[in-house]
Amino acid sequence: MTAAADGGLERARRVLALARRVVVLAGAGISTDSGIPDFRGPQGVWTKDPGAERLATLDAYMTDPEVRRRAWQVRLHSPAWEARPNAGHRALVELERDGRLTLLVTQNIDGLHQLAGNDPHRVVEIHGTMRDIVCMRCGARTAAPAVIERVRAGEKDPHCETTFEGANCGGILKSATISFGQQLSVIDLARAQLAVEDADVLLCVGTSLGVYPAAGLVPLALAAGAKVVIANAEATPFDDEAAAVVRGALSEQLPRLVEPIAEGPAAES
């Protein structure tokens, strides 16, 4: 770790040590050390294969059976099914146990925060989850493994098998993730915004802060008087406005970042 990076970590520790209400905004960078590639980084899914972005576009998915077939094969072979939380995820669990984490807003769809031990009621999956499947016609929701097994057994483009008055719905099935062209949950976004407006610190981890509306939480936090701490491998558009910037692998840096939390005001009360 360079001296500059070490200084950023120490500044971030001091900021967190004074905070009572911390909101975390997490991105794909926190899961890369669990074996899940990010999307826009140097080795990102869309960086290496720009055509893959079409699989995450709602209009293409709904109108093109071949896109759906490819998407189901990607889901079937996703490394996320075998991935396990890393030390970065566990550090955020410690932040919650410390009593300062008010909300964890994640752009990730892998569910690793909950697997690590974060309270699901304190996690907002603003881009949805890959662990559920939803019917685009009737809205029926089911756990993903059941549908994934249908694909493994040979179905190329599975459709909804929910029955209504003896008839199958037959609607298009899709992972319960937010695709390009699909609206975010108004409730989830409102929860995130309200929490940020009440926070002392917005801790951004593993996110390029280039995707809106999630990235819009940063100016919202700054306008509300909160400090922003950014921990990310690459530069972000908000680095100059942050109280501290931490570089390096999050599985190494986040445990160091939360270590001194017990020395803060919450431990004295």
Where are these regions (language model features)?
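Conserved catalytic core of sirtuin-type NAD+-dependent deacylases
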Residues: 1-269
